[in-house]
Amino acid sequence: VLYGMGDKIAKSLVEQGYRVRVYCPYGELLPGMAYLIRRLLENTANSSFIRQDMENRPIEELISPPVIKEEKEISIPSTPSTPSSPSPLSSFPSPPSPLSSFNPAADSDYAMEELRKKSQVAFESVKKELGKTYLPLINGEEVETEEKVDSVNPSNYSQVVGKVGLINVEQAETAMQAAKAAFKTWRKTTAKQRADIIRKVGDLMEQRRAQLSAWIVLEVGKPVRQADAEVSEAIDFCRYYAAEMERLEKGYNYDVAGENNRYIYQPRGIAVVISPWNFPFAIATGMTVAALVTGNCTLLKPAENSAVIAAKIKEVLVDAGIPEGVFQYVPGKGSVVGSYLVNHIDTHVISFTGSQEVGCKIYADAAVLKPGQKHMKRVIAEMGGKNGIIIDESADLDQAVVGVVSSAFGYSGQKCSACSRVIVVETVYDTFIERFVEATKSLNIGEAELPSTQVGPVIDDKSQSRIREYIEKGKAEAEVVLEMSAPAKG
């Protein structure tokens, strides 16, 4: 709610258990007055719940100066005063019970000196561990591999973040058999036990937030604030899915006359999680803990570019007490190990985030019933896609510019939600372009580790070459309004 408007409503919402944010505009007088007028217009619109609640009040009461009451004087009506003036709270659903409530993790506020220092210390600590070897985890044990690959810092190709052991097909089969054996026990574990483990995973991630953010920055080149936000998202996945599992475990009644119909959920079996490099921590965590908390044994095969970060997820899960064989960390070549696991007759669920080409192939492979396979595989695929933003003459151009810049250049445009084109109505085109160009010029380009960096490196040489090809196509087909220099590497 806006400061000074709807104080009673805000207090009532808080008393009922809802999270309420009070915000206050600040700055120069004229923009501030313009903002106030806009809010007044919104509050007096026909659809405004404030208007619906207040329109039957006497005009003298509405325009009277506000009176500050003591806390004890403020009363909250439990029912509407009249049938014609319903309470603004009547349209809200009942708040969730405390056991199932969900409060998102807060991002680090780097305006606080303490958190800035904590981040610096974390980077110093993580850099001392660079170059270590990370081996697959199969049936609770780390196993040696014939092949290892270097994961390098996109901001500095000479800096090896870690050496990752890649499994072969034989080791993938060993992992699959270990998962089959563990599933017999894991499926019978109570929902509360599974949820408690996943909640502990979230708590450990919260404790290690600064270090985990540093690993994300160094391995995939994501700027510090965005890396920190990704850790928050991973923590949210753990806590939300744990609460949801406890809710779903109760099942549902769908009764008709003369029948008692009870629906309950059961684990499907073995889940193969194939995670991307552009959200190496949040998406990998989300897909993995969702499968685990619902009682499925899970094999995590991360993208090669972000396999060290996935190893950190492995460490957290092990420290949280995940049983042997229930979770396994199986880095490997996608075309070999990934394909083998997708086509395995004992795979029940495939959770994939990545390109459309690979996702469609997974769908096609999963649809084929293999000899000895007694179930249909389920595929959850989030595939590549870029979003266009449409701006018409009614848009707030200041907000539009901020939104487009954030979407297009956040994580160097490597998110699947990144804006790759903007469609602007002709009447506001010139004004928008002028502001957009100036806003883009203000972006700081540099190494992801630097606090001032807003646009860091792309993930590898292949990605950079592809971007440069599109730049050349743009020069040939359209008018260039801005071109800025960028480092030769990254």
Language model: regions and residue ranges:
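Hydrophobic faces of well-ordered beta-strands that scaffold small-molecule active sites
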Residues: 1, 20-24, 379
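Long hydrophobic segments that form regular secondary structure
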Residues: 1-15, 426-427, 432
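Glycine-enriched alpha-helix->loop->beta-strand junction motifs that scaffold or abut catalytic
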Residues: 14-20, 44-46, 344-350
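Terminal low-complexity tails and localization/encapsulation signals of metabolic enzymes
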Residues: 24-170, 181, 188, 192-203, ...
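Residue-level signal for inorganic ion chemistry
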Residues: 140, 158, 179, 194, ...
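Conserved helix-loop functional segments at active or binding sites
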Residues: 181-189, 203-207, 211-214, 218, ...
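Rossmann-like NAD(P) dinucleotide-binding subdomain of oxidoreductase/dehydrogenase enzymes
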Residues: 217, 245-399, 452
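ALDH superfamily catalytic-core signature
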Residues: 321, 343-344, 349, 357-490
